[in-house]
């Protein structure tokens, strides 16, 4: 029979041995962390030397069509009206100019040309319209007196405006946990004004590629396709400097993509890499490239300089063409960036964006 004293004599050596092993084990872990270039912060969390922490996404490469309606309406230019005084310019210089975004008329939000028409034709006649617009990122107010157009029998401002943007590009990645996607690697801009319009509502689709216009010196090529004849893939929510963003709602589409580990910008080195893209809208293929150099000094979406070395892509498209923006760049089995621009004078070369920058949005 054991007495209390005997039990204590047995327990103490065991406790001491356990503490010794624990100290050695903890010390081993600390030494391992210290020698792998990481550090322990004072809050007890592991810092990874400014690299993107180990994250897995689904690799893109699909050519997708997109269409969205903007917040506010974009001014493209003046439109002469046929009034009782013949054809006239109703808008004075600098009152509203190409590239302005009209967001309110008479304190009412406007997002379509029809919104503006309704407000103008339901206010007292001959009363000036109060306009709130955005010019180069800054809001300003002005007034315009609508004119009665005899051809349409409606009051109008005398402006060409638009509120719909569409195009095609390449999907970069999908987050498997949230089903959020990113594509293009740069903002979508209106072709006439260069203005990037904010998204009110939009969608992305599978894109049917009809052909390829090859890039030649001085003239960038392009993928040519039908934008809205494909299957709806998801919702477009944001148009930002680092790409377009939204949510994939087509579950079958998500399941067709393979996972890949994200690499931080500090993992990129000059040398061989791959880009993934589709030239027919159906099959995603990997093509050889060479990363020439990187710029880590906040170069926007021109962080990476790359060169196409794959003869298949050079023969088929002449190099990088419009529609390939967003094509994932993979090096050493990790997603490190996306193609964003082509050199106009050399279609075999272009720029890319660090994947870190796309993920930060």
Map each language-model feature to its residues:
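PDZ/PDZ-like groove recognition
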Residues: 65-95
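Serine endopeptidase catalytic core focused on the charge-relay Asp
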Residues: 148-318, 322, 331-332, 340, ...
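PDZ domains, with a preference for the canonical peptide-binding region formed by the helix
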Residues: 104-138, 257, 346-348, 353-357
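Gram-positive cell-envelope targeting signals
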Residues: 1-57, 171, 354, 359-361
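A short glycine-leucine-enriched loop at secondary-structure breakpoints
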Residues: 87-101, 122-124, 319-323
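Conserved PDZ fold ligand-binding element
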Residues: 91-113, 329-332, 336-337, 341
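PDZ-domain C-terminal substructure recognizer with occasional recognition of PDZ-binding tails
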Residues: 64, 97, 117-157
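Short, flexible surface segments
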Residues: 71, 98-99, 125, 269, ...
